[in-house]
């Protein structure tokens, strides 16, 4: 099995600085041969060059402060997704107690815990949806928990417990069902990067990443460095079902329960394209 490449905070900050270098060259703020060095970046971010060097090399002592991360993000003209990502990598967005700095043997709530968090009312509401309304629940890590008949009509080879991105790369049916497979897969990989930023020290995330790393197209998309945490509100998924093309505009929201197993609720109505 190939060794899977993950991303550290230092690597993420280095990528952002180099991306900002390319942007400045493109808009004429830097000459083509001029480097946006650590020294230049540190001066603009009002930190020392030696500290930025330590951050990029992952040798800085202690946890980097949120204020310093914000200064670097602003200096690099990075997105809010990038901001969330570096905060996750720095351990500032721990979703469960003890996640920041947790040992590799610790893990997120189990699939069984998430399944137990689905109440009979939640399942009934999902099952009673109209035949053209695709409805399902996932964990925050995009593991499928439960879905209605309309969902399984469109995605017949999916099962509860599946990491949905693995299906996109590993199922022979995925490219036929997903009309815009490459666009959807790239979004999924960007979302996976966000998941790895937040949950990457857990055993589940490490195993899922290693399995995905076996797919060459996944590795190529991972190298692009894109990060996401949700679909755009106007994003339309295009699927092929029963020989016809359909669109779905998905609605997503988080549900929280006393079981400490948050759940993502999703639904979208099928309409002919």
Q: How would you describe each model-predicted region?
A:
Residues 2-11, 62-117:
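Short amphipathic recognition helices of helix-turn-helix/homeodomain-type DNA-binding modules
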Residues 227-273:
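Low-complexity, glycine/alanine/valine/leucine- and proline-rich hydrophobic stretches
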